[in-house]
Amino acid sequence: MRWIGKVGEEDLDPKLLMWDLHRHVDPALVPPGRTVVSFRFNDVPAKIRDWWLVMTAEEVDVCDFDPGYDVAVSVTGSLRRMVEIWRGDLGWPAAIRSGIIQLDGPERFRRAVPKWFPASQFAQVRRSAVDMTFWLAS
């Protein structure tokens, strides 16, 4: 198994990203009750810009419409940067510190976001020098 080099614009899909994020939330890390995280991708058309994850200890649902629950924390940034976080190319701390990704909500929820949404399990797959050179050159 190996990573593709550079992710092209045609490869950026918020539905795919959100589906994968929702599949990998560890329910043991979710606070008791219902926790809602909203995502806004500010670089995509309005129709696919806003997403919500509704999390409980039993399940995580992904919504492309406002489910009507109070939002615990909002995540705002570009789809490309969120994909980079998911791929492991960009870490949550660096993305947050630099302002690439903004988190809005109580501190305990802002601190939990990186734990709830870690990089993909495939982020640990070593990339070849060719893949990395291509990625770093772009």
Feature roles, as predicted:
Residues M1-D61, E107-S138:
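Acidic, aliphatic-rich amphipathic alpha-helical segments
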Residues P27-A28, D61-D64, D89-P93:
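Short, flexible, solvent-exposed loop/turn segments with mixed acidic/basic and small polar residues
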